[in-house]
Amino acid sequence: MRIKRLDITGFKSFMERSVFTFDEGVTGIVGPNGCGKSNVVDAIRWVMGEQSAKNLRGRGMEDVIFNGSENKPPLSMAEVSLTFIVDDTDQLAPQYQGFSEVTVTRRLFRNGDSEYLINKTLCRLLDITELFLGTGVGTKAYSIIEQGRVGLIVSSKPEDRRHLLEEAAGVTKYKARRKAAERKMEATDANLLRVTDITNELEKRLDALSRQAKKAEKYKKLKARMRDIDLHAATHRQLELMAEKKMLQSRLENLGSEERESLDRVKELEETITRRRTELEAETAALQALAAEVHTLESSLQRDTQEMTYGKRDLEETRARVAAAQVELDGLLARKAEMSEAMAAREAELSGIAGSWKEDEVAMQVAQEELRRVSQLQTEVALRLEQERAGLVAVATRLANHESNLVNLARQRGDLGARRAKLQGELETLRAQEQTLENVRGDVAKRVEDTRHLAAELAERKGQEEDALTRTRAAFTENEIEVIALREELSDKRSRLSTLEDIQKNYDGFDRGVRAVMTRAGVQAREQGIFGLVADVINVTPRYERAVEAALGERLQHVIVESRDKGVELVDYLKGHAEGRGSFLPVPALDTLPAPLEPDFSQPGVLAHALREVTCEEALTPLVQLLLGDVVIVQDVATARAWTESGGPACTLVTVEGEVFRPDGTIVGGESEGAAVGALQKKREIAELATEVARVEERYNEILTRHYTLQKQMGHAEGVLKGLAKNQHAEELNLASQEKDLHKAGEDLARVRERVRALEVEEGQLTQSHQALEHEEEASRGEVAHGQADREGREERVKQLVSEQESLRLRAETANGELTGLRIKVAAGSERGESARKELDSLVSQRQDMETRITRLQATVVEGGARVEELARRTTDTEGGLSQRAEEHRLAAEGLEARRAAHTTASAEVREQDATFRELRGRVDELMQGLSQISLREREIALELEHLAAGIRERHQVELANELHKYHMLAALAPETEAELKDLRAQVEKMGEINLTAIDEHAELSKRYDFLTAQKKDLQSSIEQLKEAIQRIDATSRERFKQTFDVVNEKFQAIFPRLFGGGRASLILTNEGPGGEPGVEIVAQPPGKKLQSVNLLSGGEKALTAVGLIFGIFLIKPTPFCLLDEVDAPLDEGNVGRYNDMVKEMSKQSQFILITHNKRTMEVSNTLYGVTMEEPGISKLVSVRMREAGAANDDKVTAA
C-alpha cells in the first residue's frame, strides 16, 4: 500500500485545490520558509485522523480552514483526500479487501460539523483508525517524522520511545484489542454487579413473598369462616330487629292516646295561669314605680348631704392656696430686682469685646483679598502653560507623523514598482487557467445532467412504491382495527359463555340438595337414571320463556328421574348425607295422562298453549305434558279474568309478563326470585352465544389471515422502498458531489475571470498611485520644515511660563501665612464674645420665666378670693333644703311597704298554680319523650337494618335478604361462636396488610430469579474468558515486542556506523515503568567519543542517531510510505550524503516523501514539488520530474 494522490482544498494556506501525485521512489517538496510546505505534512496527518489541534500547529481545529488573505475571503470548509494503491499483500479489513485503491477523505466545516469518508462512503473516525492499525502508518507512527519529532525520539522518556518499536512489532492492534477487552470487561463487571444487586434484592423479596403467600392462604380460610359466622349473626339480628320494631309500633299507639288527654288539661290550666300572671304583672309595675320614687328621694337626700360636706372642705382648701400664692409672689418680686443688675453688667462687657473683634476681621479680609489675587494669577499662568505644552505635543506628533510618512511613501513607491512587474506574469498565467477551467466545467456539467436524470427516475419509482406502501399501511391499519374489535368481541362473548356454562355446570343458585344430586351424578347421570333438571331438558319459544318459567316456578329445578324408586333413593341419599332438600319427578307413562287441554284461540288475548311452545327429547314428552298440559298463555291479567268469568274450562292461565292464575283460585305475581328465575333464558343464551362465538371465531380467523398477509406485503414494500432510498441517497450524494464540482469549477472560473479584471484595473491604479505618492512625498517634506520651527518657539515660551509660575507660588505661600494668623486671632475674640452673650441670654430667659410666674400667681390670688366668697354662699343654701327632703322620703317609704305585702300574697297564689301546671306538663313531656324515644328507636332499627344489609353487601357482595332463608331456621349463635368470631377478627387484624396476589407474584418472581441467576453465571464466565483473552494478548504483545526489539537493535547497530562513518550504538531495555512495561534507552558512541547516553550528543548527532533508529525499524517493518519533514536540516554535508544514500536504498521498499531545503537531498528525488506563495497567505504548487527535466533545471527548481 502506497500513496497515489493527495488532494487539498481550503486547508490552511492551500485555498485552491492542489493535487500531489506521488510515484514510487522519492518525492521531494521544496520551497522558501513560510510558503506552506509543512502544511502538506499537517494535511496528511489530519486526513489520517489527527484530533489534536496543537499537533497541527493551531489553537483550535477550525484553524485548519483557510482563513482568508488580503484579497481572498475565508472559506467555509476544508477538505483533504488521501488515495492509496492497495496490493494483495496488504492486510486490510475484510470490507476493503478487493479494492485496488482506497481513498480516505476528511471534511471540516466552519460551523464545527465534520465528515469522514472511505471511498466516498461516510464512516467513523474509528474505521479510519482501524484501517491503519498494524501497518506502521498513523498519526503517531514512525511513518511521519517531522524535524521536531527527530529530537523528541532521542530526548523523550524510554517509555515513550517504546511506542515506535510497538508500532513496528504490530503490537498497537493488540493493545487496541486489549483496551476493547478491558472496556468490555468493565461493562460486564458493571452488569454483573447490577445483576448481583438485583438477585440479592429478589432473594429478599422472595423470602418476603413466600411468607406473604402462606399468610394469604391462611387469611382466605379465616375470611371464609368469618363470612359464614357474619351472615348467620346478621340474619338473626335482622329477625330480632324486625320483631322489636313491631312491638314498638303497638306501644306508640297507647302512648299517643294518653298524650292527647294530658295536653287538653295542660291547655286549660295554662289559660288560668296566664290571666293571673297578667294581673300580677300590673301590680308589680305599680310597686316598681313607687319603689323608684322612694329611691329617687333617698338619692336626692344623700346627694345634698354629701354636697354640703364637700363645699365646706373646698372652702378651707381654697383659703390655704390663696395664702401660699401671696407668699411666693413676694419672694419672686425681690429676685427680679437682683437679676436686672446682673444683666446690665454683662451688656457692658459684651460691648468691649465687639469693638476689638471688628478691627481683626477687617485685617483678615484684606489678607484674603491678596491671596485671591495671587491664586487667580497662578491659575492664568498654569492655563497658558498647559496650552503651550499641549501645542508643543501636537507639533511634535505632527512632525513625527510627517517624518514617518516620508519613510512609508518611499517604501510604497518601491513596492508599487515590484507589484507592477509581478502583475504582468500573473495575468498571463490566469488567462491560460481560464481556458482550462472552461473545458473542465463543460465536462462536469454533462455528468451532472446525466446523474440528475437517473436521480429523477429513482425518485419517481420511489414515489410509486411509497404510494403503494401508504395504501398497504392504510389497509393494514383498518384491518388491525377490525382485528382488535373482533378480538375484544370474541373475548367478551367467550367470557360470558364461560360464565353461563360455569353457572349451569355448577348449578349456582339452585338448592343445595339439587346441587348435591347433580354434582354426584356428573356426566353419567343418564346411566344412573337421572335425566337432569326440568330447566335443562326443555326448550321454549323465546317469546314465551317468561310465561313458561312463571307457570313451572320451582318445578324448573326439580330433578327428572326414570322412576319413583329412583326418586326415593335420591331422597334417602340427601337425608343420609345432610345435603339439604330436593324435588324429584319420575317420567310418567303417556297413556296414564289425561288428554291435553285444547284452548279456544278465538277468544281475544288467548295466545298459545304452553305445551305447543315447548320441545324436548321424545322420551320426556309425557313429563312435559304432565307439567304443561293444562297451561294456557294469555296476553294480560284482563284476558285471564275474562276467561275465568266467562266459565272457560279449568286450567292454569299465565300471562306473557308472568302472572299465574291457577284453577284453585291462586294468583301468583310480582317480581320472581330464586334459582328458577331466568333459567330458560340462560339456557337459550348459552346456545345463542355458542353459535355467535363460532361465527365470530370464523370471521376473526379470516381477518387475522388477511392481517398477516398485509404485514408480509408491507414488509416487502418497505424492503423495496429501503433499497430504492439507498440507491436514491447514493445518487443524491453523487449528484451533490458532482454539483459541488460543477459549482467549484464555476467558482474557480469566475474567480479567475474576476482576478484577471481586478489585475487589469489594479495595473492602471498602480500607475496613478505612483504619481500621487511623489506629490505627497514633496508636501510632507515642507510640513516637516514648518513643524521644526514651530516646535522651537513653543519650547522657549514654556520655559518663561514655568519661571513665572514659581514666583507666584512663593508669593501665595507668604499671603497664606499672614491670613492664617489673623484667622486664629479673630476666632479667639469671637469665642469670648459668644460666652458673654450666652450668659446674658440665660439671664434674659430666667427673667422672662420669673415675670410669667409672677403674673400667674397674681391671677391665682384674685381668683381664690372670689372662689372663697362663692363657696360660703352655697353652703348656707344647702343646709336650708336638707330638712325638707328628709320628711318627703319618710312618707314615701311607708306607702311602699304596704304595697309590697299585697303583692307577696298574689305571688304565692300564682306559684301554687305554676306547680300544678309543671307537674302536668312534666307528665306530657314524659309521654312526648317516650314517643320520641320510640320513634328514634324505630329510626335506629331502620338504620341498623340498612347498615346491616350494607355491611353484608360491602363485606361479602351478597344481599342479606337473599341469605335469610339459609339461616332463619338455625339456632342463634352460641356464645362460643361469638368468641370464635372475635378470635378470628383478632387473628385477621393481627395479620395486618394481606397481599392476596402474593402467590402469583411469588411464582413469577421465582421464574425471574432463576433467569437472572443463569445470566449471572454467564456474566461470570464471560469475565473469565475476557481475562484469559487479555492474558493471551499480553503474552503475544510481549513476545512480538521482544522479537522486534532484538531485530531492530541488531539493525540499528549495523546502520549507526554507516551513518557516522564508524562508532557504535545499541538499544537497552530499562526497568518496568509506571505502566508495567520496560522502556527503550539509546546509548551511542560516535567515532572518537566515549560511549554515552544519546541525550549528551550534539544536535546533529542526535538527529542522525534518530534517523538511524527509524531506518533500523524500516529494515524489518517497512511502512507503505515514509514522510520526513526537514529531518536533514541539522546535518552537515557529509552526514547528508550518508543520509541520502540510506533513503535511496530504502526507497526500493517504501515510498519516501521528503520536505527539504538541502540541494543534495533534492538531487535524490525522482519528483520535486515546489510550493510558493506568490500571493501573500496563499500557497501554490509547481512540480518537476527530475528524470525528465535533468540537471539543467536544477537552479530553476531550487528557485521555486
UniProtKB/Swiss-Prot annotation:
Record GO cellular component, one term: cytoplasm
InterPro entries in alphabetical order: P-loop_NTPase (IPR027417), RecF/RecN/SMC_N (IPR003395), SMC (IPR024704), SMC_hinge (IPR010935), SMC_hinge_sf (IPR036277), SMC_prok (IPR011890)
Main location: cytoplasm
One Pfam entry name: SMC_N
Residues that span the membrane, as ranges: none
UniProt keyword annotations, A-Z: ATP-binding, Chromosome partition, Coiled coil, Cytoplasm, DNA-binding, Nucleotide-binding
One of the protein's GO biological processes: DNA replication
Binding site for ATP: P32, N33, G34, C35, G36, K37, S38, N39
Any one GO molecular function term: ATP binding
Cellular localization per UniProt: Cytoplasm
Residue span, SMC hinge domain: 528-644
Domain of life of the native organism: Bacteria
UniProt-annotated stretches for the region Disordered: 763-795
Gene ablation phenotype (knockout): Conditionally essential, the primary defect in an in-frame deletion mutant is in chromosome segregation and organization. Cells are temperature-sensitive; they grow slower than wild-type at 25 and very poorly at 32 degrees Celsius. Increased sensitivity to DNA gyrase inhibitor novobiocin, cells are longer, and contain 2 fully replicated chromosomes that are not completely segregated. ParA, PadC and bactofilin BacP are less organized than in wild-type. All these phenotypes are stronger at 32 degrees Celsius. Synthetically lethal with padC or triple bacNOP deletions.
Ranges of Basic and acidic residues composition bias in the record: 772-795
Coiled-coil zones: 171-219, 252-342, 679-706, 735-762, 1002-1039
Subunit structure: Homodimer. Probably forms the Structural Maintenance of Chromosome (SMC) condensin-like complex with ScpA and ScpB.
Comment text on domains: Contains large globular domains required for ATP hydrolysis at each terminus and a third globular domain forming a flexible hinge near the middle of the molecule. These domains are separated by coiled-coil structures.
Cited function: A conditionally essential component of the chromosome segregation machinery. Required for chromosome condensation and partitioning. Important for positioning of ParB-parS complexes (ori of replication) and of the ter replication site, as well as for segration of the ParB-parS complex and thus chromosome segregation. May act via the formation of a condensin-like complex containing Smc, ScpA and ScpB that pulls DNA away from mid-cell into both cell halves.
Family the UniProt entry places it in: Belongs to the SMC family.
HAMAP family xref list: Smc_prok
Name of the protein in question: Chromosome partition protein Smc
Organism lineage: Bacteria, Pseudomonadati, Myxococcota, Myxococcia, Myxococcales
Gene giving rise to this polypeptide: smc
